Structure formats: C-alpha cells, structure tokens
C-alpha cells in the first residue's frame, strides 16, 4: 500500500497566504499554460489548502483549492491568484521555479 503524505486542510491555517472562504480571482493569463483556460480570470472561493510535502510547505506554501461556481474546483499556486501585486507574484513564481530546478533564487540571496 502506498501512503500519500499530502495534507489537505479545510480550515484556516496561521501563516497561510489565504483564508478559507476568501474570495479570490484567478490571474487572467498563464504564461506557462499550466492553468486551465476555463478558470483564467474567474472569481471563486477558497475551500481548501493542499500541502503535497507538508514538511517543506506548511504553513505558508500550499496549493490553494478554489471553487468557481459553474466550473468546479481546481488547485492553484498562490502566485496564480490575485492575492498580491503582479510584481510580487512574479518574484514568487521565479523563486518557486529556481527551487524546483535546484538553483538559488534571488530571494535566497537577500540579506
């Protein structure tokens, strides 16, 4: 039997970038094409926080489960939602990509 280490939470978590029940808007475009076209620019409600690797993601780096009426639910990275100014979302996305590829991001070099 394979055990899934994911942690799915449906209540507020101190330190998470959003609150359950918060209204959020999905960014209007996806440069890398990872967001389903039908969700782009849509507004929905946060219904869950998903931590694929709780040891490294909890509490501030979850996937955010969003329910969009008439479309259903999908998971989004924080930078794929309009929670912060675009410049901040871009910095977060660059950092996340650098971490995935094993490099150091400019955020890690800051004092």
Swiss-Prot record:
Induction: By light. Pfam families: SH3_18. The keyword Transcription regulation applies. One of its GO terms (biological process) is carotenoid biosynthetic process. Keywords: Activator, Carotenoid biosynthesis, Transcription, Transcription regulation. It comes from the Bacteria. Involved in carotenoid biosynthesis. Antagonizes the transcriptional repressor proteins CarA and CarH by preventing their binding to DNA. Can also dissociate preformed CarA-DNA complexes. Does not bind DNA. Monomer. Interacts with CarA and CarH. This is Antirepressor protein CarS. It comes from Myxococcus xanthus. The lineage of its organism: Bacteria, Pseudomonadati, Myxococcota, Myxococcia, Myxococcales.
């Amino acid at each position: 039997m394979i055990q899934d280490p994911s942690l799915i939470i449906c209540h507020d978590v101190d330190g998470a970038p959003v609150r359950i029940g918060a209204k959020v808007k999905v960014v209007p475009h996806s440069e890398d094409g990872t967001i389903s076209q039908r969700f782009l620019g849509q507004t929905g409600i946060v219904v869950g926080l998903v931590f694929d690797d709780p040891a490294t993601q909890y509490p501030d780096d979850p996937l955010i489960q969003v329910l969009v009426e008439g479309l259903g639910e999908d998971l989004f990275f924080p930078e794929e939602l309009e929670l912060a100014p675009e410049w901040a979302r871009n910095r977060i996305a660059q950092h996340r990509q650098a971490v995935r590829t094993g490099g150091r991001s400019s955020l890690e070099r800051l004092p």
